[in-house]
């Protein structure tokens, strides 16, 4: 079973924090917190929660890169040690393609990666298509976390 964790940038200092997600629950201004839960036999208590910028909240995929680092939503991964072979981690709907015709034959919802166009080949079919993010793909492509869309927006533009 996958560990359900979130991370976000603290509102007070921009530092990343990971833990459980807690909605402030008050009407009006939306306030989101991330922190630890203390689980007792009969109780669950929130402990050490910090307010985070809601725009930076990312969910843990349950997967790790080739070096054992957690892969989060919106992370940027480098494949095969090649700085021009970059992908972004995404959760959502994507097309399942027929391997012979490359036409979309189905749609699924789940963790996948989207190609970041950095060179001519990454803009060409079939290399530009989204693929499921699985342990097998991570291992075969030697994927490594090199940043996130929040900390390294220049990587999304395709320049390392």
What does each of the following model-derived ranges do?
Residues 1-160:
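Secondary-structure transition motif
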């Amino acid at each position: 079973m996958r560990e359900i964790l979130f991370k976000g940038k603290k509102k007070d200092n921009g530092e990343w924090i990971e833990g459980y997600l807690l909605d402030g629950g008050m009407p009006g201004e939306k306030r989101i917190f991330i922190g630890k839960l203390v689980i007792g036999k009969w109780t669950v208590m929130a402990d050490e929660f910090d307010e985070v910028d809601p725009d930076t909240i990312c969910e843990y995929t349950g997967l790790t890169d080739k070096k054992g680092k957690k892969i989060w939503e919106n992370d940027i991964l480098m494949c095969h040690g090649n700085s021009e072979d970059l992908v972004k981690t995404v959760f959502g709907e994507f097309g399942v393609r027929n391997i012979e015709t490359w036409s979309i034959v189905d749609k699924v919802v789940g963790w996948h990666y989207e190609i970041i166009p950095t060179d001519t080949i990454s803009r060409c079919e079939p290399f530009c298509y989204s693929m499921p993010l699985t342990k097998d793909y991570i291992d075969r492509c030697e994927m490594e976390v090199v940043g996130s869309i929040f900390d390294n927006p220049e990587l999304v533009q395709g320049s390392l």
